[in-house]
Amino acid sequence: MFRIHCNKCFRRRNVEPTLIFHMTQCQHVLCASCLSESSTDKKCPLCKRDLRAIPIDKNLPPNVAQYFEDPLRFQQLYRKISKFQADQRASDNLGFYRQMQEHEKNESRLKGFCKMEAQFNQQIQKEKERIAELRAYIKYHEEEGLKEWPHATGVEKPWSNQARGLRPRTPSVTTSDNTQSDEHMTTFCLDSDIDCLEEDEPRRYVKKTFNGNIKDFHI
């Protein structure tokens, strides 16, 4: 801390406590005597600028009083301020880094969901095609059943592929393409058509085939 003194005549405040000192707007210190001498031309005797001054006492404005305080106090204060602001910047950077990590995770999850959606859409399209095949297959056999139904009471008429038209492919009952052949359909039989032998004898299965004649159909 410096000793308050007049920058023109160098009189010190600690030597003359009753002497009033002033601080000018140009940051010079003048005693009352030197200030009164310069009041005629209203110029600072040191820098010749316009003279405006206030007395140095306890009523100094805060922005002027801090010029007369120990700078070490400001050094410690600014050190705390600097540390506080550095911590806040580090916290902000950490928050931004975590947000970027979360954004990358969400982006990865979104890509996975998009792949799943594409797979589901592809599977749905396959199922729609399979349903269309099933409907065509059912419609074909329903129409053939209506055509052949009058022959149940009348004279049998041999089936003709030309009259029946092109038979649709037997659709798979599962999502995998396990198409049943015509040979498999000709050996199709119901559980009630299985003849069982006596319990003490080995069981033999006799499969009855359905050749298309309505008279031969039994349950």
Swiss-Prot record:
Instruction: Give GO terms: molecular function aspect only.
Output: SUMO transferase activity; zinc ion binding
UniProt-annotated stretches for the region Disordered = 161-181
SUPFAM superfamilies found in the cross-reference section: RING/U-box
Biological processes, Gene Ontology terms: homologous chromosome pairing at meiosis; positive regulation of meiotic DNA double-strand break formation; reciprocal meiotic recombination
User: Which residues belong to zinc fingers classed as RING-type?
Assistant: 6-48
Q: Supply the InterPro entries for this chain.
A: Zip3/RNF212-like, Znf_RING, Znf_RING/FYVE/PHD, Znf_RING_CS
Taxonomically, which superkingdom?
A: Eukaryota
Which keywords accompany this UniProt record?
Answer: Chromosome partition, Meiosis, Metal-binding, Zinc, Zinc-finger
Q: Which GO CC terms are listed, alphabetically?
A: chromosome; synaptonemal complex
The record's misc note reads: Nenya, narya and vilya contain a RING-type zinc finger domain and are named after the Three Rings of Power given by the elves of Eregion in J.R.R. Tolkien's books.
* Record function comment: Required for the formation of DNA double-strand breaks together with narya and vilya during the meiotic recombination process. Plays a redundant role with narya in chromosome segregation during female meiosis.
Indicate the quaternary assembly: May interact with itself, with narya and vilya through its RING-type zinc finger.
Instruction: Give the protein's recorded name.
Output: RING finger protein nenya
Q: Which organism is it from?
A: Drosophila melanogaster (Fruit fly)
